[in-house]
């Protein structure tokens, strides 16, 4: 029997596959035939631990009849993406919202947006002009550059309020010069994740004794270039307070700014249980749908990789750095869905600049994948697909998360890495919480009661 919305299961659906820049208004329009409880307040977006939108949301409806209407929207499109709609309940929604997203529930409402696809050499003044009429906080624009001092084609912008940031999102796909600009929701947590390293790691400017080539094969170390890479996750002057202004100055304990006022510190990614290749490099996936690239031109940038996979829209790109501080010619690319990751494999042997990138597919559906040998392998896929509402790429045992970790260095490198935290920390996908919920639903029910 369906219980009322005040207690018990309620009238909730879960939505998956939303565009990254999706707003509450767009979700309301998508469900225009349904009565959403409290309007926009009844739409609860799910965020990654970095504060990025996960492409999923819960929608609270007014009755069981409205739930049935909402479920009929399953597989309809929003923009160029089809959206999946599943039946859910208050128990699942409350648990997921509590265990996902950055620590502060308000960090996704602090006025940040992320821009992608900026023209080379784009200045902060051009961004101010692009957002003409929308108030940006002082020192609120940051143009990250890569380790070679070149623009990544991205920017973080903080507006005076979340309402203004929502207006900024409506400029998605408008142009600066000849380039159209993609705009995504962001947060202070995302900025800190990418730019604010633990201070005690800043001294590790050279690779440690275990950061040598080959240490990753079956070796339980952080892996290739860990000291250098974590050192590179500088600076913003101790976090948020040190954003560089329009003129440029030393930002604090990182590399500082260049003469254009651009931050010279840039982080490509964090750590994870996914270990690829000979050096044991690490990459943290928030979706569980990753493509590993090898054979890239050494001058390739993140923007080059985004363009390589066009018209697909990767969620994130991580370019690997070796223990000598140089690029390895490898990268990890994260996609929103298993389907996108599989579609990316069509780029097998496609050219990037003067080099072609070869392909190797290691994709599993509902089971952990083995490591395959192939002499032409240069592009790896680590992506798992489960049934609707099921766990993606995760197995649970006694409440401990054992992530499906695909290793590409041979049998010796295959390891199981557990992650604890209500069964969530060790999962390789945002959708992995479904399986945990099933195993612990009785506990959640008793806690709520």
Swiss-Prot record:
PROSITE patterns for this protein: RRM
* Glycyl lysine isopeptide (Lys-Gly) (interchain with G-Cter in SUMO2) crosslink site(s): 35, 87, 98
Which residues does the record list as Phosphoserine (modified residue)? Answer: 23, 54, 63, 310
Q: Where is the RRM domain?
A: 11-90, 111-188, 289-364
Gene Ontology biological process terms from the UniProt entry: cellular response to interleukin-7; mRNA processing; regulation of RNA splicing; RNA splicing
Q: Residues bearing N-acetylmethionine?
A: 1-2
Q: Where are the sequence repeats?
A: 234-249, 354-372, 374-392, 418-433
One GO molecular function term of this record is:
RNA binding
Q: Which residues lie within the region annotated 2 X 19 AA perfect repeats?
A: 354-392
Give me the disulphide-bonded residues: none
Q: Which SMART domains match?
A: RRM
Could you state one GO cellular component term attached to this entry?
nucleoplasm
Region annotated 2 X 16 AA Gly-rich approximate repeats, chain positions: 234-433
Dimethylated arginine occurs at 233
Annotated function: This protein is a component of the heterogeneous nuclear ribonucleoprotein (hnRNP) complexes which provide the substrate for the processing events that pre-mRNAs undergo before becoming functional, translatable mRNAs in the cytoplasm. Mediates pre-mRNA alternative splicing regulation. Inhibits, together with CUGBP1, insulin receptor (IR) pre-mRNA exon 11 inclusion in myoblast. Binds to the IR RNA. Binds poly(RG).
Listed under subunit, the entry gives: Part of a ternary complex containing FUBP2, PTBP1, PTBP2 and HNRNPH1. Identified in the spliceosome C complex. Interacts with IGF2BP1. Interacts with CUGBP1; the interaction is RNA-dependent. Interacts with MBNL1; the interaction in RNA-independent.
What this protein is called in its record is: Heterogeneous nuclear ribonucleoprotein H
Native organism: Mus musculus (Mouse)
Query: What gene name is given for the protein in this entry?
Result: Hnrnph1
